[in-house]
Swiss-Prot record:
Transmembrane segments: none
Protein name: Protein HP_1247
Signal peptide from the UniProt entry: none
Keywords: DNA replication, DNA-directed DNA polymerase, Nucleotidyltransferase, Transferase
InterPro entries noted in UniProt: DNA_polIII_delta, P-loop_NTPase
Length: 340
């Protein structure tokens, strides 16, 4: 099925197993989050186990799916995988997992196969094999597959409008289009920006969008980032930036952009086991810069990124409320997350 079919299905019922794949990684990620939340809402006691390609263990996954929920907690297993070059995975593993779900239980399975642009032939072979196992499963329409394509501009804008409506965000179609264009038509970045704009709790203006999306990635900001990772006095560098006329909001935006890029590197490395800067950034930076991105990305674990992004969220909210020089409050906490 395609995205429209998946949306319709999820309004009617929940599957036991779902396979998400295709050419657009953002939708794979989005529907993993969405379906996981639906499972959690339907069964608040369900426990989620997340596996990347790097920590994939067939026996552990099968055990989680085979356990009888009558005598223990139910499991939601989420596989975020890219097997273009992953030797531990065998397509027949999927058959084992689906058979485990044939037993009466509340266990559930979500598989997200992220697009392997470096090996499209292998990706197609793997995704086709998984689809066949799902189609042959006795679970029938409780085991579903959804393929995602790169959306056209109008489809992306419609998706963003639906998100804005969900957030009760007062933003015109013209400004929504402006946000999308400012973000180089990156649906994932634009989607996240809507959440940030929602904290304003007021009609959105072009100035709000420009302030949110401006790039503060200059050399002085790089000094601050370097200070955070090298355990130098980040507060002294921050104080210097303020005295040089840099706005607190600009510093925050620059840090958000940098750590977002780091997280993309982190997720890509965890998923593929490879460091491909062009895949992540859309261009190939000098080797030294790419290696520095990869090194810094692995300094944090997923929980660390969540804590950093939560700090950025609080910083942004308090900045919107008129508080000044919030870096003095938050930079030390970020540095401790990087250097525990």
């Amino acid at each position: 099925m395609y995205r429209k079919d998946l949306d319709h299905y999820l309004k009617q019922r929940l599957p036991k197993a779902v396979f998400l794949y295709g050419e657009f990684d953002f939708f794979i990620h989005y529907y993993i989050q969405t379906i996981s939340a639906l499972f959690k809402c339907d069964n608040p006691d369900i426990e989620t186990s997340l596996f990347y390609a790097s920590d994939y263990e067939k026996s552990q996954i099968a055990t989680l799916l085979e356990q009888d929920s009558l005598f223990g907690g139910s499991s939601l297993v989420v596989l975020k995988l890219d097997f273009a070059l992953h030797k531990k995975f065998k397509e027949n593993d999927i058959n084992l997992f689906l058979k485990a779900l044939e037993r009466p239980s509340h266990n559930r399975l979500i598989i997200g196969l992220y697009n392997a642009k470096s090996d499209t032939t292998k990706y197609k072979y793997t995704s086709d094999a998984i689809v066949k196992f799902f189609q042959k499963s006795p679970l029938k329409d409780e085991a579903i597959c959804a393929r995602f394509f790169i959306p056209k501009t109008w489809e992306s804008l419609k998706f963003l409008q639906e998100r804005a409506n969900f957030l009760h965000l007062d933003i015109s179609g013209h400004l929504l289009n402006a946000l999308f264009e400012i973000n180089n038509e990156d649906l994932g970045v634009s989607f996240n920006d809507l959440d940030k704009l929602a904290v304003l709790n007021a009609p959105i203006t072009l100035e709000d969008i420009q302030e949110l999306s401006s790039n503060a990635g200059d050399m002085d900001l790089q000094k601050l980032i370097l200070g955070l990772f090298l355990k130098k006095s980040a507060l002294d560098i921050y104080d210097y930036l303020l005295k040089e006329g840099k706005k607190d909001a600009d510093i925050l935006r620059g840090l958000e952009r940098y750590f977002y890029q780091l997280f993309l590197f982190f997720a890509h490395i965890k998923t593929t086991g490879l460091m491909d800067a062009k895949e992540v950034l859309g261009y190939a930076p000098p080797k030294e810069i790419a290696e520095n991105y990869a090194k810094n990305a692995l300094r944090l674990k997923e929980a660390g990124y969540k804590r950093v992004f939560e700090i950025f969220r609080l910083w942004h909210i308090q900045s919107m409320q008129g508080q000044k020089e919030l870096g003095f409050l938050y930079l030390t906490s970020i540095q401790k997350i990087i250097n525990p």
